Amino acid sequence: MSNISDAFKNGKAFIGFVTAGDPDLDTSLEIMTSMAQGGCDLIEIGIPFSDPIAEGPVIQEADLRSLENGTTTDKVFELTKKLREKVDIPLVYMTYLNVLFKYGYDRFLQNAKDSGVSGVIVPDLPFEEKNELQSVADKYDIDVISLVAPTSEDRIKMIAGDAKGFIYTVSSMGVTGMRSEITTDLGSIVSHIKSVTDTPVAIGFGINTPEQAKKYSAFADGVIVGSAIVNLVAEHGKDAPKYVYDYVKSMKDAIK
């Protein structure tokens, strides 16, 4: 069993995402350390990919900046090992099937384990193919995180019943990015999930203000924020750690 459940032991969880290697690997390490210091309960580390289909323009551009800087999957593993020496909160990777295929499931997951990572999120992994990856991940105590999008009640329950670590509930169809308003009936999706599993539920895609975080954490176990953090990195570059710290703290304070 992974340590992901630790993220949900101190009340509502704030989960932050950042692209590894943007603006550079050293600053990335500082940014992720400041995220933990600001109150992140779990960090999603994005392994950059040239065609991140689930991402909106903010994270797509971060992936391209990182790749142009020479970031590789191996360098992300090394970066994560350094981060693991500085923070003790759970860490998960977010990447795409192509990255796993090229690397090989077993070798990727072995390196993820050695880097101190507890889970992987693969947005383009079909639910029907999840077991193949999870069977390898089980060898290394790594959870393959399930994503639940607005869909039929039966499918929501099927995906949730099989989930490990936490359930990433997608607030709206489409790509990641900041939204001023989320119209999906997330309350009913979360209640469908909770009717079949005790696995914690976190809501992501579009959350960027303390008010939104407070609203959705009222019925979910945590909130996930990516684009708003990545946007601060794009805006402030090497000076981003202090801005990210302040932002994370404001979001965590809102859901306490």
Where are these regions (language model features)?
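N-terminal amphipathic alpha-helix/helix-capping segment at the start of soluble metabolic enzymes
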Residues: 1-18, 79-85, 256
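Hydrophobic faces of well-ordered beta-strands that scaffold small-molecule active sites
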Residues: 14-18, 43-45, 91-95, 120-122, ...
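Active-site-adjacent beta->alpha loops and helix N-cap segments on the catalytic face
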Residues: 1-7, 49-59, 71-81, 101-107, ...
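Alpha/beta catalytic cores of nucleotide-metabolism and tRNA/nucleoside-modifying enzymes
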Residues: 191-199, 208-214, 218-256
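Glycine-rich phosphate-binding active-site loops on the catalytic face of alpha/beta enzymes
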Residues: 40-51, 117-121, 126-129, 171-177, ...
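Conserved, mostly hydrophobic/aromatic
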Residues: 16, 35, 46, 112, ...
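Glycine-rich beta-to-alpha transition loops that act as phosphate-gripper elements at the mouths
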Residues: 19-24, 94-101, 126-127, 147-151, ...
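Catalytic cores of alpha/beta
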Residues: 25-35, 151-161, 203, 207-223
